[in-house]
Every structure is written in structure tokens, then in C-alpha cells.
Amino acid sequence: TYAMLIQSWRMLLAGWGSPLGYAAAVRVWTIANLGRWIPGKVWSVGALGVLARREGVSGVSAAGAAILGTLLNLGAGFGILAVSGTRVLGVFRPWLQTAALAVSVCFVVGTLALPRMLPPVLARVARWRGIAGPDQQLPVGTLWLSTAINALSWVCYGLAFAALARGITPQLTA
């Protein structure tokens, strides 16, 4: 799953005009993720920007791609949850099923609208922070493919967890 997330990050970077080779991306991603063990949880994104800059990539693009990738990952996770678990959620509380479907619909609509919404939002944030925004707009296909990769990574997490559960729990016989 990390290989998929790294590739998704690379695609977002390349879409913003900052291509990075896969080996360098793995190195940057792996070292930056060590920052999650430092209290504050923001160190990973900062480290990602600094390490990517050492590789000749814009630190702003690297951090922005990491934040956007995280948002796409969270939305894809909610989407997978809604598709795979809405009936189970409805057993606990009927409104959870409706809420999960609503969140998933919002994510899909948001992902479809993202190519239109992202450029002005990024320009506003860049002006507010006093930094240069990305040199180019992310291609629509890159956003959607990155979202699909994130959804696939959630499916892989689920399959791995199912294999773990099956491997460590005794088989129930009828």
C-alpha cells in the first residue's frame, strides 16, 4: 500500500510540474514518515517539503501534494467504507448508513469538482501565506487517478486485515 501512496504523491507532484524519480520518492517518503513519531504530527509534512527540496523539487509542491493526497486518501477511505459497510452500519444505528452514503456522495462530488475548485483555493492560500503557488494546474486525470489509487490502497488494507484475522483466529465450524 505504501508503494501505491508514494506513486499517488509522485503523480500529484508531477502534475504540479515537479517530477521526482520513484527511488528518490521512496527515500523522501520513508524518511519523512519517521516524523510521525515526533509529537505534533505535522513534522512529516514539513520533512517531506525539506527532503523533496533537496531532490530539486519545490518544497511547497511536495507539502501541498502530501496534504492533497491525505485528503484524497481520507475521502477514498470513507467511500470504501460506504460501499462495503453501509449495511453493517445500519444495524448499529440506521442513521449511520445514511450518513456514510451522504459523506461518500459529498466526496465523489468534491472529487469531480476539485479541478475547478483547487486552483483558486491554492492561489488564495499562497497569497495569504506570502508564497508562490504551484506553477501549473493539476490535470483532471491526475486527480482522479490519484483518488483511484488511494481507494485501491484502502481495498488492499482491508484484504490484508481480513487475511490477518483469518490467520490468527480459529476457524469456526458449523
Give the location of each predicted region.
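Alpha-helical transmembrane segments of integral membrane proteins, especially early/N-terminal helices
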Residues: 62-73, 104-112
